């Protein structure tokens, strides 16, 4: 097959029999088309007849492959994407989860759509990530990245915290609330949406600041240019049990008086879709919007 891809990496949902079956089928399908296939190590433990030299760490997969195929739900895609965004690698997903905003391909009969993608007939989007840093006494203590959102919150349910928010060092607001969601357009259909945040289409260079149960009736979500730097300064009156969650996967500890800096990361995720992909069609299907009236 004449393809822009040569080496394809497979990443799967751990301990999921249906995902494992799809991966096995996918592996056989790609080998039959003549591609070099490598498999993420944890994923490979679920499959049979995978040569040991084709089992690699996720970072090595990002370095060696031209295309990564993630089999699972959006959570699996997020975990892989935070690592793969560091590399010049295209990523596509086969949905073995629930909603599947980021995983386009249907596990039943994915072959036809995937073969079109492999022949070069696809739509590519570049999704930016957030870089999250925690500073204590002006010293960087921890950092990570997020594809969907960074969430400042207490580690207790229904526990109020106090903080100030700055945009490019301009004071914006102080708040007593359960926390704050800082979302990318990719994450605007995830936790942010559940918190009352706006849907941001993927091409927008914007981030949304969504308060979580604020102790005021005037607090509303705020959308700002993604090239701005968001800084959250924690009040000294807070308890010690605070944290910043990145995509609900990585947790950074935060203490009273710390500052959390959130900004657009330099690297972007190369997310690809079948040629007939429509973002609005995905919204309509996943969110059960009404069909056309005429």
From Swiss-Prot:
Recorded GO CC terms = cytoplasm
Q: Which domain of life is it from?
A: Bacteria
- Keyword hit for Transcription: no
Q: What is its EC number?
A: 2.7.1.23
Location within or outside the cell: Cytoplasm
Q: Which residues are noted in the entry as NAD(+)-binding? A: 74-75, 148-149, 159, 176, 178, 189-194
Q: Name one Pfam family in it.
A: NAD_kinase
Q: Which GO terms describe its biological process?
A: NAD metabolic process; NADP biosynthetic process
**SUPFAM superfamilies reported in the protein's UniProt record:** NAD kinase/diacylglycerol kinase-like
Q: Which UniProt keywords apply?
A: ATP-binding, Cytoplasm, Kinase, NAD, NADP, Nucleotide-binding, Transferase
In which broad location class does this protein mainly occur, judging by the first location in its UniProt entry? Answer: cytoplasm
Which residues of this protein are catalytic? 74
State the needed cofactors, names only. a divalent metal cation
Which Gene Ontology MF annotations are present?
Answer: ATP binding; metal ion binding; NAD binding; NAD+ kinase activity
- Cross-referenced InterPro entries: ATP-NAD_kinase_N, ATP-NAD_kinase_PpnK-typ_C, NAD/diacylglycerol_kinase_sf, NADK
The catalysed reaction is: NAD(+) + ATP = ADP + NADP(+) + H(+)
Q: Which PANTHER family does the UniProt record give?
A: NAD KINASE
The similarity annotation says: Belongs to the NAD kinase family.
Primary role: Involved in the regulation of the intracellular balance of NAD and NADP, and is a key enzyme in the biosynthesis of NADP. Catalyzes specifically the phosphorylation on 2'-hydroxyl of the adenosine moiety of NAD to yield NADP.
Write the protein's name: NAD kinase
Q: Which organism is it from?
A: Pseudoalteromonas translucida (strain TAC 125)
Gene this protein is translated from = nadK
């Amino acid at each position: 097959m004449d393809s822009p891809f040569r080496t394809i990496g497979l990443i799967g949902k751990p301990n999921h029999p249906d995902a494992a079956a799809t991966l096995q089928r996918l592996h056989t399908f790609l080998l039959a088309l003549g591609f070099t296939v490598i498999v993420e190590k944890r994923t490979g433990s679920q499959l049979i007849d995978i040569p040991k030299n084709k089992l690699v760490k996720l970072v090595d997969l990002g370095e060696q492959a031209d295309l990564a195929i993630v089999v699972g739900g959006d959570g699996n895609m997020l975990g892989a994407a935070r690592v793969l965004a560091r590399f010049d690698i295209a990523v596509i997903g086969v949905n073995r989860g629930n909603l599947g905003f980021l995983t386009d391909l249907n596990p039943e009969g994915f072959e036809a759509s995937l073969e079109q993608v492999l022949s070069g007939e696809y739509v590519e989007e570049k999704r930016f990530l957030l870089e999250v840093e925690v500073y204590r006494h002006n010293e960087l203590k921890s950092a990570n990245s997020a594809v969907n959102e960074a969430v400042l919150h207490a580690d207790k349910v229904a526990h109020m915290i106090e903080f100030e928010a700055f945009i490019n060092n301009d004071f914006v607001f102080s708040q007593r609330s359960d926390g704050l969601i800082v979302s990318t357009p990719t994450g605007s259909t995830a936790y942010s949406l559940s918190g009352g945040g706006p849907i941001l289409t993927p091409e927008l260079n914007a981030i949304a600041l969504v308060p979580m149960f604020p102790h005021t009736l005037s607090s509303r979500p705020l959308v700002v240019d993604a090239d701005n730097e968001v800084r959250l300064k924690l009040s000294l009156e807070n308890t010690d049990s605070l944290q910043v969650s990145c995509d609900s996967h990585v947790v950074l500890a935060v203490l009273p008086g710390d500052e959390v800096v959130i900004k657009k990361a330099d690297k972007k995720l190369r997310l690809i879709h079948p040629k007939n992909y429509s973002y609005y069609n995905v919204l309509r299907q996943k969110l059960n919007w009404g069909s056309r009236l005429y």
